[in-house]
Structure formats: C-alpha cells, structure tokens
Regions:
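A short, flexible loop at the N-terminus of ABC-type nucleotide-binding domains that lies
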Residues: 1-4, 9-20, 70-73
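Helix-to-loop junction immediately C-terminal to a conserved catalytic motif
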Residues: 49
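Short coil-to-helix segment of the ABC ATPase nucleotide-binding domain corresponding to the Q-loop/switch region
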Residues: 93-101
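Conserved ABC ATPase "signature" region
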Residues: 64-65, 105, 112-130
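The feature captures the beta-strand-to-loop junction immediately N-terminal to the Walker
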Residues: 34-36
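ABC ATPase NBD coupling module
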Residues: 66-82
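Conserved ABC transporter NBD signature motif
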Residues: 57-65, 77, 117
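ABC ATPase nucleotide-binding domain signature
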Residues: 80-81, 85-89, 94
Length: 133
C-alpha cells in the first residue's frame, strides 16, 4: 500500500510541483497518472522512489516511512513499486512472457514465482494467447 498525507514538493526557486496531495493506493491497485506536461506526474513518482524529497507531508510505501529510510535501503523500496511508462521498452530477443518476467528475474525471484506472477499478469491484461510470440 502507498499512502501520501498532505505531501508537497517545492523546488528551489519556489516552483510548486505538488501541493498538499493526500491519497492511498491499495496493494495490487492500478493507478494511471494523466496530466499536462509539468503537472507533477514524474515528480510524484520520484517522491515514491526517493529521488526527490517531499518539502512537507508523509509518504509510506509498504508500511515503510520513506522519509526515515536510510540510503542503503532505497533499492529495497524501489523493488516494491512497479511502474509502466507511457513508452514501454521491450527486449527484441524475448517473447511477451519473457519480457514480463524480466523484472522478476532481475530481482532474483525463484523460477516458480516468476512463472506464477507472469501468468497472473498475462491473465490480467488478457495476453495469454500472445505469451510466446
């Protein structure tokens, strides 16, 4: 679960990227960030990934207070968040199943976990027929 409570991000010079954002994203929930250029979409993600630090407010990811997270734990935090960008990149030498499984492989997941989670995602987006294309 991701929780943001009264989160603001103001850059040096006073430019406001995010102002008093409060929201909850449940585990397994899909969220689409849509908005004009400069509306704070990327800044929101960078706050979650701890690339940016909130000017005020509280951010929790998987019950972890991001503001108190030591630097060495940031990669562990980032593994708990999945992001698909507007221009997804696919590896040409891999089929659909292998492209979906790639992130799990990199994270060191066990083969049976990779198989199960990848099949679940294929079901979710109705791509079972294209898994090995």
């Amino acid at each position: 679960m991701i929780k943001l409570k009264n989160v603001s991000l103001v850059f040096q010079g006073g430019s406001v990227a995010i102002s008093n954002l409060t929201t909850i994203v449940q585990e397994g929930e899909f969220v689409y960030l849509v908005g004009h250029s400069g509306s704070g979409k990327s800044s929101f993600l960078k706050l979650l990934y701890k690339e940016y630090f909130a000017t005020k407010g509280e951010i929790e990811v998987a019950n972890i207070d991001v503001s108190k997270l030591p630097k060495w734990k940031i990669p562990l935090l980032r593994r708990k968040i999945g992001i698909v960008t507007q221009e997804p990149q696919l590896l040409e030498n891999r089929n659909t199943f292998e492209n979906i499984a790639f992130a799990l492989e990199v994270m060191g997941a066990l083969p049976e976990e990779i198989e199960a989670k990848t099949n679940t995602l294929l079901d979710l987006v109705e791509l079972n027929d294209s898994a090995y294309k």
